[in-house]
Every structure is written in C-alpha cells, then in structure tokens.
Design a protein with these regions (language model features):
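OB-fold and OB-like single-stranded nucleic-acid-recognition modules
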Residues: 15-140
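Sec-dependent signal peptide recognition
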Residues: 1-7
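N-terminal signal peptide c-region/cleavage motif recognized by signal peptidases
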Residues: 11-12
Length: 140
C-alpha cells in the first residue's frame, strides 16, 4: 500500500452523502465507502452510457486493493470511473437527474493518464467498485 493511499485513507472522513446526489439517478444503488478519494491510472476504455454518464475503465497505477472480484472479472481488472450527465441521456428514468446540469469535467481518451477525485462507492446493482461521481479530473 503506497504512503499516498494511506494518507488519503486516514485523512478523508467517511460521510453518508454522495456529492451531487440530485444528478445521480437511483442513488440507493450506490454505497458510499469513502468521499473525495484521489487516484491515478491509465484509461483502458471510455463508454457513453444510456443514463448520460460516461463510464471509464481505469487501470490503476497502484491501490489494487480498491478493486473487488467483480472489477477483476467484469471490468478487466479496472476501477469504473463515472462522469455524470456528460453525454446524451436516452434512458427514461435518468432524464430527470441530468436536467439543468452541465458537465464541466474533461473527458479523457483511451490511453490518457489521469488523476481523478470522486466518491469511492460500491455499485450494488453491478457488484463492482467505482468512483461515482467524478468531482475532479486532470489529464496528464
């Protein structure tokens, strides 16, 4: 475990509320583990989802302990990163969540190295770990 991860783990308080919950549809499907977690890695895949979010598979530089078995088997050993309301919403139950919201997070490309901050959550619907929503992203 890297010293940076240990510092982040113990300096961040765990809170029971997600960032921007009004712009996340069905928030009950996400279990907050840690707020404001900063990680880095290389973009393995970028997917525009029907709910308006952009899903990014991030191959982590370190902190592989942030992954669970579902990340290994279903996400090719990557952490899922979600930039909310960043593309066209076609999923009916997600339209309201993105209404009057303008994404300001930059969208990385395949192969980009990024530093990303967001809420580290368990997606109970899919079973894998994510950063959702991303609150800050730097493309290096």
């Amino acid at each position: 475990m890297s010293p940076l991860f240990i510092l982040l783990l113990f300096s961040s308080s765990i809170i029971a509320q997600l960032h921007s919950p009004s712009h996340i549809y069905h928030t009950e499907r996400l279990l907050l583990i840690q707020s404001n977690l900063t990680i880095s890695g290389t973009v393995d895949k970028v997917i525009n989802e029907k709910d308006g979010d952009i899903h990014i598979r991030l191959k982590l530089d370190s902190c592989s302990n942030l992954l669970n078995e579902k990340n290994i088997t279903s996400q090719h050993g990557c952490l899922v990163i979600e930039i909310i309301c960043a593309c066209k919403v076609t999923q009916p139950d997600a339209i309201t969540a993105c209404k009057n919201y303008s994404n300001t997070i930059p969208i990385p490309k395949l192969g980009d190295h990024i530093i990303v901050t967001g809420d580290y959550v368990l997606d109970k619907q899919h079973g894998w770990m994510e950063e959702h929503p991303v609150t800050k992203l730097i493309i290096q």
